[in-house]
Structure formats: structure tokens, C-alpha cells
Amino acid sequence: MKKYFITFGGGHQNFIDAGNRLTHQAKQLDIFDNVILFTDEILKTEHADTFWDKHGKFIEENKRGYGYWLWKPYIIQHVMKTLDDGDILMYLDAGCEILQHKREKILEYMKYVESEQIIGSKTAV
């Protein structure tokens, strides 16, 4: 079983910086096999034919949520398609923080996911 962490930082330098900070925090936990930061540049280049060509104009015309968060289900689904059964995916918004002293709590949640399949939360750990 592999554990993946993803976030998105794009649209404005503040969000790119927040995404970089968050992926750094995720790597420091030493829990995840793969930590992925999606950016607007990645959507425009690596996902041009599957996402950007269709939604780019809307995103650029609607600044709030970088296109009303249209990218969020896309990046989650994109990564989920690559997972094997039993793998775990954790997504956090770039404005979140991962506190190192919460590592054990995150591992506890991952054990819960093994039996319950999914956890959703509107607040951080």
C-alpha cells in the first residue's frame, strides 16, 4: 500500500508559495511515498489536452478559486486513476498547514481509511 499526498498552488504567487510550503511539510512527515504539487503551469503544459484546452479560458476569466476550484476534482481524479487498490490519497488545500507533532494522528486516520475507505473533513488535523 502506497500513500500519496497532493495539493494545488496556482493562479497567484501566494498560492504557489503555499503549495511549496505544504508539500515541504508533507515530505517532512516521512509518511508519503509520493508528494505531488500541481501548479497552473503543470495544468497548462502536462494537462493541456485533457484539461487546460477545455477549461483554461474559464479559469482565467474567473479569478476566485482559480476558476471556482474547477481544477480540484480533476487533479484528485487524475491521481486516483493511477492508484492501486489499497493505496491512500490525501489532498489538502494549499492554505492548510501540516504540523509535525500531528504525525501520529495522521497515521491514525490512515489506519481508519484502511477499513472505512474514505475520510472527509472541513478542518485540518
Please describe what each predicted stretch is:
Residues M1-W69, I76-D85:
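N-terminal anchoring/stem segment of glycosyltransferases
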Residues L92-A94:
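Active-site flanking residues adjacent to catalytic metal/cofactor-binding acidic residues
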